[in-house]
A protein has these predicted regions:
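Non-catalytic accessory segments flanking enzymatic or RNA/DNA-binding domains
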Residues: 1-168
Length: 168
């Protein structure tokens, strides 16, 4: 939704918004260092959530539980805590080798949720796969947060809409 000049200059569209492992604010490099101090150089969590299936994700500490609710998580568990966005992104990249970082939104909306997934067990499996250099960020004794959402029924079919083509 940004014009090109804004897209390449706004801190809101920095590469690290979608790819935290590319953040350079911790090295003093940013489109807007004041913005980065509030968004990138703050505590971040790496989390495991259950939407349709399990996924790994990153969010600022101030965005818990908002991020989980935005993504439609029915369960979520903090995995690691870091002092900045870059560190959280590096852990997420390691974990994406073993667990998705995407929400299967079609299955989620149809309520096809794999309730058999044990987030505590999954966390232990992921810790065992995590590079040693990231283990000091791992959190212990975290509780699983659970969420439920009001609904009348679930759709049988779900498809995306191109809002630019609606009513065209």
């Amino acid at each position: 939704g940004y014009c090109y000049p804004c897209f390449i200059q706004s801190p809101n569209t920095s590469e690290c918004i979608l790819r935290p492992e590319l953040c350079r604010a911790q090295e003093g490099e940013a489109r807007d260092m004041e913005w980065s101090k509030e968004h990138c150089l703050k505590a971040h969590y790496v989390y495991i959530s259950l939407t349709a299936g399990a996924k790994i994700g990153v969010t600022r500490a101030t965005q818990i539980p908002t991020r989980w609710i935005d993504q439609g998580a029915v369960k979520a568990l903090k995995f690691a805590k870091t002092s900045n966005r870059y560190e959280a992104g590096c852990i997420e990249v390691e974990m994406k080798k073993h667990i998705s970082d995407r929400t299967a939104w079609q299955r989620m909306l149809k309520n096809q949720i794999d309730e058999s997934i044990d987030l505590y067990k999954l966390k232990e499996q992921l810790i065992n796969l995590l590079d040693e250099r990231y283990r000091n960020f791992i959190l212990g004794n975290e509780i699983i947060e659970t969420f439920s959402y009001p609904h009348k029924s679930f759709p049988e079919k779900v498809k995306s809409l191109d809002l630019l083509k609606v009513n065209s």
